[in-house]
Amino acid sequence: MMTKVLGMAPVLGPRPPQEQVGPLMVKVEEKEEKGKYLPSLEMFRQRFRQFGYHDTPGPREALSQLRVLCCEWLRPEIHTKEQILELLVLEQFLTILPQELQAWVQEHCPESAEEAVTLLEDLERELDEPGHQVSTPPNEQKPVWEKISSSGTAKESPSSMQPQPLETSHNYESWGPLYIQESGEEQEFAQDPRKVRDCRLSTQHEESADEQKGSEAEGLKEDIISVIIANKPEASLERQCVNLENEKGTKPPLQEAGSKKGRESVPTKPTPGERRYICAECGKAFSNSSNLTKHRRTHTGEKPYVCTKCGKAFSHSSNLTLHYRTHLVDRPYDCKCGKAFGQSSDLLKHQRMHTEEAPYQCKDCGKAFSGKGSLIRHYRIHTGEKPYQCNECGKSFSQHAGLSSHQRLHTGEKPYKCKECGKAFNHSSNFNKHHRIHTGEKPYWCHHCGKTFCSKSNLSKHQRVHTGEGEAP
């Protein structure tokens, strides 16, 4: 189980004595304070994982409550199976990481296991480079080892888990660019010399405690780097130590908070949506490193996702998921439209498309529709009305979508591009058919012989063998 909450709550100071009216009031305030900053998804996950049998009167109630908590966390009504699987894999992946890396990755709030892996790979590359510096999330520019030290180990007492005010320590000066991003309050101190003087006076009584924290932070820094090096057999431990020594000797110390030069050395906080990661091949920019890593595969041709059944490789995990369905041959639940499913629940969900209430009925053929607009568009088939005309060649269409698709023949526009091979298409249906070549997906299933097809037209041709209308292709 993950020992930390994804994301960091804002740093809070100690409560004034006058707020602590009574034990009950203190308890309520702490609950509200925690609930305010916990991400909802992580809060539901913790409720599910920390639920105890003693909280319910009996086994049936316990099972029922667990189901409710699980649904609140995984949200099956809005998440797909792949998204739910990714949440579970991400949780387990963070659990098996070494403690030092686990805390660091959680601070970056990865949304998927793939993004967590990309963060670790980026960290390895940064540690391999001379004069490296560990990147931190935009909202909290704090040293990695300082974060781990402040956010705690598994055996901390409850009192130590309370948020503490940020302390300025001279121990961070020796780390060069790995410094703390100034918050709004600290920037006010930097602009007002009187506040800087008051701040220094208030921290002089805690110098011994700061020195102890600094030594602990140094030890944790060495721990997280040693974990990375230990998992890289090609890296030399001696070479890494030399790099660390050179770094300590050459990096300029952090200037005082009150000096103008010190304020200029602090990196500016990235603006939301800023695209700082640029592809060296084509110049395309991305807002995070994981998207850049995925994009690079279009240039390198790398396909890290391999099917364990047939060995076929893919550049994206989503394509592997689609392909893997082709090996799940057992699809006993089929629909009249030709699609087949491995579970009856999936078939029922699909059949709702056919059994939806359709109050608008065509007088000519009896076909029903759920919306009036759909009936009007359908009725043009019988009347032959084609109100949408192409200005280039004069060809007319019964639907606006047909005109838009046709006009791309004149403009040459092909907005639907395949990520695997780069081929582009002017219509989404053509793109979907082409994409099945890469994934191997064959969703159309013959209920007579079990043969599968990638398109409905191929299934219709094949079924003529069983009906006696013609030969199979």
From Swiss-Prot:
Give the matching Gene3D superfamilies. Classic Zinc Finger, DNA breaking-rejoining enzymes
Residue ranges of every copy of the SCAN box domain listed in the record: 45-127
Q: Name one GO molecular function term.
A: zinc ion binding
Q: What does UniProt give as GO cellular component?
A: nucleus
Q: Where is this cross-link: Glycyl lysine isopeptide (Lys-Gly) (interchain with G-Cter in SUMO2)?
A: K27, K221, K232, K349
Listed Polar residues bias regions: 148-171
Query: Could you tell me the keywords of this UniProt record?
Result: Activator, Differentiation, DNA-binding, Isopeptide bond, Meiosis, Metal-binding, Nucleus, Repeat, Spermatogenesis, Transcription, Transcription regulation, Ubl conjugation, Zinc, Zinc-finger
Please identify the protein, giving its name as recorded.
Zinc finger and SCAN domain-containing protein 21
User: Which gene produces this protein?
Assistant: ZSCAN21
